[in-house]
Amino acid sequence: MFNKSYLKKNLTYFLEIYKNRPIKNNKSGMKIDHCFALYCLLKKIKPKYIIESGVWKGQTTWLLKKVLKNSKVFSIDIDFSNREVIYDDVKYLNKDITQYNWNKLDKNKTLIVFDDHVCFSKRLNFLKKNKFKHIIFDDNLPNHHIGYYTPKMIYERQYLIKKEFIKYSNIYRSFKFIIRYFNNEFANNVKFNFNFKFIKITYSIKVNKNLKKNFDTFRNKIKIYYEFPPIIKFNYKKRFEKVLTNFNESISHSYNVKKPIFNMNEIKLSEELTKELNAQYSNICYINLN
């Protein structure tokens, strides 16, 4: 969708906007890599309507309004308690995206931005029924790195292997695990690894005919599947530092990421922005459906 020269040129324009972002520390929200991806995709697609599923503090809403001032934005979240940025002309909705009637929107001119941490397999029937064409998915991680299905997994024909980590220091979760364990609530093929600081649970693959059918149908409708590249070379250790440090996970050598936009010696950013690079990159993607 984009060549490198276009992306390099547009990063300069983006940074002029991004330096004035309202939330400097957007922990758990979009940072520089994904905000730049969203910026470029918005300028490319130019939707008339934008449905933002997952608001958090409102940084993404701010970027949507900044890039496309005349687009109608619907911002959805079941919990607005963390919101810091609010607009009078944005329609805020507090139920799941599936609970609203979107029939009046021109689907060819409507973009959905999914950043709600909901399994993408649960969105397929909704997308099919409503005939949405343009989708951006934020947390598009591959297998072994997230606890639910993402477009990347479905596109690459991966079936979810779910992992769960429970620290003994988390009394509530540890107690809940003990109850589940002694009530035989885990399937026989679930694997347990009892570390001295935590428990690692690896669940078996669950595939049924309906799930496979939905995945096949979705793949057949894809016209474009595009993963936006990281700004600089992907740093696996930096991105997954918490899991690697706290749960002794090994580095995955099968984690495929697109080639970066810049070499390290080609770009100079402030210390603040440099810290954001790779800190949240999750293979953000754009999907265009038939």
Residue spans of the language-model regions?
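A short alpha-helical cap/connector motif
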Residues: 1-111, 118-290
